[in-house]
Amino acid sequence: MACARPLISVYSEKGESSGKNVTLPAVFKAPIRPDIVNFVHTNLRKNNRQPYAVSELAGHQTSAESWGTGRAVARIPRVRGGGTHRSGQGAFGNMCRGGRMFAPTKTWRRWHRRVNTTQKRYAICSALAASALPALVMSKGHRIEEVPELPLVVEDKVEGYKKTKEAVLLLKKLKAWNDIKKVYASQRMRAGKGKMRNRRRIQRRGPCIIYNEDNGIIKAFRNIPGITLLNVSKLNILKLAPGGHVGRFCIWTESAFRKLDELYGTWRKAASLKSNYNLPMHKMINTDLSRILKSPEIQRALRAPRKKIHRRVLKKNPLKNLRIMLKLNPYAKTMRRNTILRQARNHKLRVDKAAAAAAALQAKSDEKAAVAGKKPVVGKKGKKAAVGVKKQKKPLVGKKAAATKKPAPEKKPAEKKPTTEEKKPAA
């Protein structure tokens, strides 16, 4: 497949090049704006909607009145009467069973949307330009791998076809039948309630046949699934960009292809079939930004780059980070050193003072021991021995001694052992 520029080959009904060429219309070089296409498609699609609404009486066809307050139930209106489950049930409210919906739909909603004519034409130009790019057409899902050329133009003889078998043979010769087979394979049942509303089956989109005059071409192609037929004078954005996505596979007749310049004009000449209409211009003629920015005209107007780089320094707390503190206050190192030395000096003084006090205490204890006539105890062992000596208790005198004195145990009289003579029984 080729994307031909600026001449397009015209293909015969046998699928071969007829030898004729057509100049590529300027509309195929128009800017592709998917945002505009999507906006126009969304708004125009709303014009096919049929108004719908719920009945104005729905949910209100019962007699109900609120019970008021003081009954320990909600104040919603309740059905009158008795003898049935319905009596006493809530009514009217959107939270009630059998009540009306919230904000009942009305038929006087603003169903339709008006779109500017120039904007609609811009969308059609974008859709036509996208249909000539193989990448966009293939991304849409069309099977055009074997198609000889894009845009695909055929002879005007095709407009005179009246039989479907002729149309099928043409599509097979043009290698476009793969796209129809894709449609056949995609036919399936719709999911959801559309099945109940005469929309049971769905399928993919196939090629779009664009013609100039209907000499039977509609009857020949209309029964092939997925085919869409359009008159070149009545192009529709809903058909050229289904779903609001550009890239529809289009097959043109020669006369319809030649008529595009008259319909949409070029950038040098206005459209002859539309009043005061010119093709939309590109925002940028050259889209190679690197080439534009490096051009001498742009570089001459630019200032020289600033080589100095200002790096953001991470803010650190000088009270926790000594290196940052020394940057801010170099004397902090001296202060810190003096503090450490002062603490060491004070610690040494406390240790010396404690040692002197211990020596004085030891000397005092030695003097007392010498006065008592005891050998002075020296060292830790002596201290432990001195500590370990038990104090002798003073003897108790008087009533306390009598109370605390234990009674002496009574001695049993000693039994005499019998002698041998006593042991002998009497004769």
Curated annotation (Swiss-Prot):
Q: Which residues carry this modification: Phosphothreonine?
A: 266
Cross-link (Glycyl lysine isopeptide (Lys-Gly) (interchain with G-Cter in SUMO2)) at residue(s): 239, 327
Q: Which residues carry this modification: Phosphoserine?
A: 290, 295, 365
Its predominant location is cytoplasm
Single biological process term from Gene Ontology: cytoplasmic translation
Its subcellular locations are: Cytoplasm
Do you know which PROSITE patterns this protein is assigned to?
A: RIBOSOMAL_L1E
- Report where the covalent cross-link Glycyl lysine isopeptide (Lys-Gly) (interchain with G-Cter in SUMO1) sits: 364
GO MF entries: RNA binding; structural constituent of ribosome
UniProt feature, compositional bias: Basic residues: 377-397
What post-translational events are described?
Citrullinated by PADI4.
Any single GO CC term annotated in Swiss-Prot or TrEMBL for this entry: focal adhesion
Amino acid composition bias (Basic and acidic residues), ranges on this chain: 407-427
Its assembly, as annotated, is: Component of the large ribosomal subunit. May bind IPO9 with low affinity. Interacts with RBM3.
PANTHER family according to UniProt = 60S RIBOSOMAL PROTEIN L4 (PTHR19431)
Identify this protein by name: Large ribosomal subunit protein uL4
- Originating organism: Homo sapiens (Human)
Q: Which gene encodes it?
A: RPL4
